[in-house]
Regions:
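Small cysteine-rich, disulfide-bonded extracellular modules of the LU/uPAR three-finger superfamily
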Residues: 1-141, 148-188
C-alpha cells in the first residue's frame, strides 16, 4: 500500500531585487551605452555598482496558485495551460498593501515587457530593465509580474502572478532601474 504525507505541500516565495544606477556612471563604464540593446544594457548594468538597491519579498496570487492546481489535472486541456511571465507592472500605491486575492496592482501606472527570463528548475528569474527614457515622473513603490499584457486582464490567460511593495524609487531621465523578480518553488 502506498503511503502519502498529507502535510506536505509546495511553497512559493518571491524575492525582488531593485538596483538603481545613475545614467552617467553607466555611460562612463560603457561609452557605447546608447548603441546597446535593452538586453545588453541589462547585462552591462550588472557590472556597475548601483547607487541604490533594495530587496523585498512578495505574495504570490490566488490566480497563480489556481493555475498550478488546474494544470496538475490531467484532464485539463484549456489553452491557459501554457502561460509565461511576459510583463512587469509598476504602481504608486504601496500604502494599500498586498493580498493573495489581488488581480492587479493597487495603482498600476506603467507596464513593460520583461527583458529576460531564466530558470533552473526550481527558480524563475524575470529581469526587467527600465532605461533612462522609461517610466519617468513616477514614484514607483509596487510591482507585479503578469502572464501577458496587463491591458488585457479580461482575458483568462492574462493574470497577476505576484504583488510586492517596496521603498519608493523616483524615476527620472538620470536613472535606470533593474528589477529582478525571483520566484522560488520548494517543498514545505
Amino acid at each position: 500500500m502506498d503511503s502519502r504525507n498529507a502535510d506536505s505541500g509546495i511553497s512559493f516565495q518571491g524575492r525582488i531585487d531593485r538596483k538603481t544606477h545613475e545614467l552617467g556612471h553607466l555611460k562612463t563604464a560603457f561609452p557605447q551605452w546608447e548603441q546597446l540593446s535593452k538586453e545588453e544594457k541589462l547585462d552591462a548594468s550588472r557590472k556597475v555598482k548601483p547607487v541604490a538597491e533594495d530587496t523585498v519579498y512578495n505574495v504570490t496570487t490566488d490566480s497563480l496558485h489556481e493555475y498550478f492546481v488546474d494544470n496538475l489535472d490531467p484532464d485539463n486541456t484549456n489553452t491557459e495551460a501554457n502561460i509565461s511571465v511576459d510583463f512587469l507592472g509598476l504602481g504608486t500605491d504601496a500604502g494599500s498593501g498586498t493580498s493573495t486575492a489581488d488581480t492587479d496592482l493597487n495603482s498600476r501606472v506603467f507596464e513593460e515587457p520583461v527583458t529576460d527570463v531564466a530558470d533552473n528548475g526550481k527558480e524563475l528569474l524575470a529581469s526587467t530593465f527600465l532605461d533612462s527614457t522609461e517610466g519617468n515622473g513616477n514614484d514607483f513603490d509596487e510591482l507585479g509580474l503578469f502572464s501577458g499584457d496587463p491591458a488585457n486582464l479580461t482575458n483568462a490567460e492574462v493574470f497577476l502572478i505576484n504583488h510586492a511593495t517596496f521603498a519608493a524609487v523616483t524615476k527620472d531621465s538620470t536613472k535606470t532601474v533593474t528589477l529582478d523578480v525571483t520566484l522560488t518553488f520548494s517543498d514545505v
